A protein has these predicted regions:
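Extracellular glycan-modifying ectodomains
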Residues: 1-200
Length: 200
């Protein structure tokens, strides 16, 4: 119910403001489905966090099917009146990056915070699949941050011991800037779309 109310509010807002302007959707969808995965997360936080019709503490096949249907329906509904861009999941680090770097520097054992690409794919395969289905069903576009945050083997929470995150899953200002090339296409196309919007 809270999710439904939020989506209704978003629809109302979008219907009245900047009709036709591009919409970028970026959120921690894998956490909604599988719960928190960072160090120190409470047991309740490690359970599924967002529900539609199927209530479950774990991501059962029935839960995933229900989540998938509502996710795609919502995304396609938003795409009826504007270009919609879904951002692939931002890599989640397993610990707070600045804290980890700071402790390492104090102890003379500083090293970059990373997760493996394999762990990223295992965590986010379901979200990728439903984003792909939304693209197939209603022409939604997808933005991929991995070329800017990862290499072939690892996704980085820091580079040269400089944090890219303010915690374990939110990019810092420095980290955000790495994604400017990813967003450039959106804003170039968005400027064209907005210039054609008719206002009374």
């Amino acid at each position: 119910e809270p999710c439904s109310r939020m989506i209704d509010n978003i629809h109302e807002k979008l219907a009245s403001d900047m009709l036709g302007a591009p919409l970028i959707v970026i959120n921690r969808t894998s956490m909604y489905v599988y719960g928190h995965n960072e160090e120190g997360a409470e047991p309740q936080e490690r359970k599924t966090q967002v529900f539609w019709n199927v209530l479950s503490d774990v991501a059962t096949p029935e839960y995933l099917e229900d989540f998938s249907r509502h996710y795609i329906d919502t995304a396609c509904s938003l795409a009826k009146d504007r270009p919609v861009y879904l951002v692939r999941p931002i890599p989640e680090m397993l610990a707070k990056v600045p804290t980890t770097i700071g402790k390492g520097l104090i102890m003379g054992q500083a090293h970059d915070v990373v997760i493996s690409r394999a762990d990223y794919q295992a965590r986010n395969a379901f979200v990728w699949s439903i984003q792909d289905k939304a693209r197939e069903q209603c022409g939604i576009k997808i933005l991929d941050p991995l070329p800017y945050l990862c290499d072939a083997n690892f996704c980085y929470g820091s580079k040269n011991e400089k944090p890219l995150y303010v915690d374990d899953n939110h990019l810092s200002e420095y980290g955000n800037r790495l994604l400017i090339p990813m967003f450039s296409e959106v804003f170039t196309q968005g400027a064209v779309a907005v210039s054609g919007v008719q206002k009374d």
